[in-house]
Structures are given as C-alpha cells and as structure tokens.
C-alpha cells in the first residue's frame, strides 16, 4: 500500500511539471484527443508504475492485505463534515486546543477479550501506531470506546461511575471521566482525552491501554461486562478507536512526501536516480508535446480557467483512496498577450515581459498562464499500516488564473 501511494504521488508530481509554460499546479486530465501524444499514455503509464512497484520492497506486502479495510463511521462523518465546509467556502481546518490540524488518523483496537475472565475487571486495548511520523506535530488525541446498553450492574448510590484509563506497563493513570447511568442507560460512545499519553510514549510502535471502572469513592472495580464494555458480539464499527490529530510542521509538498516514502522503504540511491531520470525524460516529452499544441487554434484563447476532471478510480488509486473518487481540479490555459487584462492580476514583471515579447517575440518569451489562487480538498484514504486517514491537501483546486 505504501509503495502504491508513493508511486501515485510521484506520478502526480511528474504531471504537474508537464503543464504549459510554468508547470502550473493542476492534476492529471483524463480527457485528451485520440491522436495526441501524452507523457502519461495509458500503456506507458501502466508500464512505468509496474516497473517501480516490481522493484519496491513494499510491493510484495501489498498482496498481504487481503482483508478489505472498512472505514469507521466516525471517520466518514469527519470527511463529510469538512468536505462540505470546503464546498461552502468555509475554513475546513478543524482544531484541537488553540492549534489547527490537517490530518486525522484512526487506529482500530486489535485487542481480544479473555473469555475465561468472569467478571471482567480490566479491558485491554492494543493499537499499532507505528505509522505516526515524528515530522508531524501532535495536536490532539482521543480514545473512543463504545459502551453497549448496560445489564444488571452493581448499584451506585449516586448513579455515577468512574472510568479510569491506565498504562499496561505501569498502571499509571492516564485519563479519567465519569458517566451517569441513571440519566443514560442507552448505548453510546465514551470519549477520553489521551493527548497526554503521547508525551510518555517514547517512539513505541505499540500502545497498550487498560480500562477499569469504579463507583463513588470506592476502589472496587466493577464488572465491565455488566457495564457494556466487553467485546463479545461486537461489529467492526463498534470496536474502540484511537483518533490522533496532527499538523504538518511545514507546508506539504507532494513530491517531498513521495521522496520520504521511497526512503522509508529502503530503496537505494541507484533506484532513486533511475526514477529521477525517468521523471526528467517524461517531463521533457510532455513539455515538447504541449508546446507543439500551442500553435493550433486553442493557443489563440486568452488565459483563463478550464475544466479538468480528475477520476482517481480511472487512475487506479481507488484501492487506497476512499473518498472522493473524483473531483474537479481545473487548470489554467491560454496566452498572455499585450495588453494584459486587469482580471488576470498580472505582476509588474509580467507586464514588462509581455510588452517586451510583443515587440520582439524571438528575444523574450511570453508570460505564463498559471494558477494565482488554489484551494484544498479533503481526502479519506488508507495508509501503509491499513489505518484510515483524513487529510486536507492544499493547492488541489484552481480557483483563479493569471499571468506571471
């Protein structure tokens, strides 16, 4: 999965550099004329990706994940909420404390009940958090535990029960909260703030937590089965999830992210150099093809925003991208000739360059039609650890075009 995502990002970057003039930042168009050559011709693209996957240590691991990943309802809800906000033009950044995050990663509990224990005094939760990167700033974390409708539970004088979250190693208290079963005996999610846990995690790949419940001022531990915290007959959607909120320490670049993924797979310098050579060759071919087209009728149109529909399923990315399966990216196309229109918001340099080009086209190239304003989109995808991740990627949709 990691290899496929890396290749996908790499292919995306190569195309970005292939757009007219100044390599404007737009995504790959699936619509092209039948006779037109393209650096991403179907057969060549498939062969290119196949070569990289075959040489990747992660390629063999991709077939190991036979069980389909089912996204948790909570993650789907997050995606729908923030993608809807983006469509309304609102700031879709969600927040934790006074900081904003652009990534939410969900880790599903891998623990199992010991059916020999009756009553069940402790519930153990296991999470594989090896995919968390130290290059991202942690800005929040919460443990979401589904509590089924309680059965015949030992009565509490106040009706209030205390949830205690402990570390498996030291039984050090990590978080706590109270629930009132007199007010609510229906099934619901209990949420514990576990941000502080990661301050003591020390780069461990496995996170082990234990839950116990007491009532009143008593230290007596209540049978968790009676309270509805047992795992028996639970669906995948009812398993506990650890939700981690992170923020990139710097503005993300898809190409840089792809390079980091190649390094994490352990590829040697020779393989990386080969990829860079292929990228340069394809970029040159793409630029030559596109420059050749600019002598046609389409080159007469002025710089403006054009349609560019991206279909992730047609690209073969739907095995790791959950949503959206397609979106409108747009791109900038057209000439920047003199006099430049004010709505194109040309820079002073672009105005001078365009004027020089109008007087002597052979000595000065024209200014470039490029995106001047871009917006983000939300993507829900599966990472290399088979965890479902929500991420907000910047600069994915062209909003305005201009001459630069």
Swiss-Prot record:
Source taxon at top rank: Eukaryota
Cross-referenced SUPFAM superfamilies: Cystine-knot cytokines (SSF57501)
Keyword flag Ribosomal protein: no
Compositional bias per record (Basic residues), positions renumbered to this chain: 278-304
Function field: Growth factor that controls proliferation and cellular differentiation in the retina. Plays a key role in regulating apoptosis during retinal development. Establishes dorsal-ventral positional information in the retina and controls the formation of the retinotectal map. Functions maternally in dorsal/ventral patterning to induce the expression of the zygotic bmp2b and bmp4 genes and ventralize embryos. Zygotic expression does not appear to regulate axis specification, but instead functions to establish the integrity of the axial vessels during embryonic development.
Subunit-structure text: Homodimer; disulfide-linked.
Protein name: Growth/differentiation factor 6-A
Organism listed in the record: Danio rerio (Zebrafish)
